[in-house]
C-alpha cells in the first residue's frame, strides 16, 4: 500500500468552515483527516500540498517515520498551520491502517479500556435565562455535563449589560461577576450531579482568574477551561499556587513540547489536546501517555466535525486517563449528508463501532 495523492475538501456548511482531506493509495483505500484551523484554509492547503510531495510513494503503515519527515523536514519547527496539516494527514494514515487490516482505530491503539466515553455539549445562550434553559434541556437529553463560555466569550451576557458595552468586548470585573451569577443559576437548575464546565477561552489574566475561581468554588465546577492565554505556559505556575479548582488547558498548543512544562510541573489537571492541531493521533497518543505518568487526564478538544469526533473518541476508548470528551454536536445529527456513517451516541456517551479505521464514511 503506497500513497498516491492527497485530496483537499474545503467546505462551508451549517454556519462554519471545515477542511477535510483524503489520503489515497494504490490499492484503492482512502483515509480521512480533518484540519484544526479551517479558517486558515488556504494556508493549510498550501502546507498540505507541500507535504504531499514528500509522502507520495510512502507506506501509510510507517506513520511514525512519516510524522518525523513532515515535522522535521523544513528545519524550522512548524507553527499551527503546518501542525494542522500534519495532524490531518496523520489521522488519515491511521484511518488507512485500520482499513487495511479491517480493525477499528481504537484497537490499533491498544484496544478498549472502556466501551463508551462520557461527553459534554456546548450549552450557549444569548441571555443568562436562555443559558439556564439550554442547560436544563441538555440534561433532559441525557448529557451528564454542561459547558458554556465566559460571559461575552460566546455572547452570553445579560441583555441589559450587552446594550451598554461594545459587541465582542470583555470587561474582566463585570465578566467574572456575570460568570458567578450564571454558575449559581445553572447549578440550581441542573442539580449537584451534573458536571459544570466554564470555558474562559484564554480571556482573563491571572488576578481575575483567581477572583473567578474564588467566587465559583462553592458551585463545584468540574473544571475551569483555558483561563490564561496560551503563549506562555509557565503562567500556569503562578496560577496553580493560588487556585484549588481543577484547571484544563492546551487546546491551542501544537506539539508535545508546548505541553512539556505544564505536565512536568503538574500545573494543570486536564490536558486539552486537539488532535487536529497537535500533530494527529501519533502526537496525541504520546502526550496522553506522558500525562498519565503525572495523573493528568485528557479532555480532547473537539470543536470540529465527524472526523475529529471519531479520532478523539478512538483515543479516549484506548486510554486510561480520560476526564470527559468535548462533543458540541451529537454524533449522527451533524453533517450526515457528508458522513452518513458516524460514531454512536446515547444518553451522554459516545463510542466507536467495530468498523475499520475511524469508523466513518
What kind of feature is each model-predicted range?
Residues 3, 28, 51, 89, ...:
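Conserved, mostly hydrophobic/aromatic
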Residues 21, 27, 32, 100, ...:
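Ligand-binding pocket scaffold of soluble enzyme catalytic domains
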Residues 1-14, 99, 103-116, 350:
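N-terminal amphipathic alpha-helix/helix-capping segment at the start of soluble metabolic enzymes
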